[in-house]
Amino acid sequence: SEMCIRDSYYADLRPVIGSEQGGIRPVLILQNNVGNRHSPTVIAAPITSKMGKPRLPTHVCLNRQANGLSCGSVILLEQLRTIDKSRLRERVGALDTSEMKQIDWALGVSVGLAEGYR
């Protein structure tokens, strides 16, 4: 099926420089669906299961097992990346509307659109 905003995929983020999240890990697709359909690249945020709890306002913790992502996984919206679609592997699942509301707010914080976070 077609890739959509709010889907998660495994992606190969190697090679890594410095503090970037790396390896083969899940990422959340954040690019709009027109871009997902036509662009050779995609905007994504890495997901980690090793953090335990969110540490920054740009972190969103999944409070349930979300279609293949483990409960307690944290989406790192301060580490947005534009990656080539060839880095994507299999689809993991999709987030629901309430989770996407949290994502939207944290994304606003990350890019300076949220009130008080410029």
Q: Predicted segment positions?
A:
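Short, small-residue-biased leader/transition segments that mark boundaries at the very start
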Residues: 1-5
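Conserved functional hotspots at enzyme active or ligand-binding sites that engage polyanionic ligands
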Residues: 6-118
